[in-house]
Amino acid sequence: MAHLILIRHGQSLWNAANKFTGWVDVPLSERGRAEATIASCKLRDYRVNVCFTSMLMRAIETAVITLTECDDICGGKIPIIKHEADDENWHGWDNYDGDPAAELPIYPTATLDERYYGDLQGLDKAETTAKYGKEQVQIWRRSYSVRPPGGESLEDTRKRVYPYFTNRILGHIKQGDNVLVAAHGNSLRSIIMILETLSEEEVPKVELATGVPIVYELDKAAHMLSKAVLTN
């Protein structure tokens, strides 16, 4: 038995400003950092062994705060950002002669990045709705296969998330590790679609609050045994 903990990043500055963010690398707001701190307290009874995040700072910030505000989560280990050997952004600079057993690895990967919103990125959501109409914007935001102009659909996001999740992340689950994934609304919807076998009609309706952990209990075959949403 293992636990998979999913957490959407805390509120970002552009969440607060009601802008489409996508791949724009915006940091957490003060509220977002507080949400991650609260999440850490909620997870104090879970011992995390490994963490995966997107490459975007709002997800990495959320992961680091969640893992460091409550020492019980790490079991005395030090969270260290690591890179896969085949990561094109890795230059070997984080190599050192240390004890891996004293580390809690955090693996950033672009496969967990938010859905790319294309031409909508940086636009105010209310102004975009006024320009294109509520129905059209809702289709761009919450349909499964329709892409916003120049961007990705949820289906596109799932296609890039699926191989990494099933091979890399579930590999740790099958070893009995407790895994934290700090990512984004649509990359997490893609994971939830797999875990809960949701249909293409069901998954766009999944709502994820910022900074709220979702804890799945999984067996060694990665089948879901239980789910808990750790709200206030």
From Swiss-Prot:
GO aspect biological process, one term: glycolytic process
Keywords, alphabetical: Gluconeogenesis, Glycolysis, Isomerase
Source species, domain of life: Bacteria
Swiss-Prot/TrEMBL site (Transition state stabilizer) positions: 184
One Gene Ontology molecular-function label: phosphoglycerate mutase activity
Stored InterPro entries: His_Pase_superF_clade-1, His_PPase_superfam, PG/BPGM_mutase_AS, Phosphogly_mut1
SMART domains in UniProt: PGAM (SM00855)
Annotated coiled-coil segments of the chain: none
Keyword Isomerase: yes
Pathways involved: Carbohydrate degradation; glycolysis; pyruvate from D-glyceraldehyde 3-phosphate: step 3/5
Tagged with keyword Isomerase: yes
UniProt xrefs under Pfam families: His_Phos_1 (PF00300)
E.C. designation(s): 5.4.2.11
Enzyme superclass (EC): isomerase
Active site per the UniProt annotation: 9, 114
Catalysed reaction equations from the record: (2R)-2-phosphoglycerate = (2R)-3-phosphoglycerate
Binding, substrate: 8-15, 21-22, 58, 114-117, 125, 141-142, 185-186
Role: Catalyzes the interconversion of 2-phosphoglycerate and 3-phosphoglycerate.
Family listed: Belongs to the phosphoglycerate mutase family. BPG-dependent PGAM subfamily.
Protein's name according to its UniProt entry: 2,3-bisphosphoglycerate-dependent phosphoglycerate mutase 1
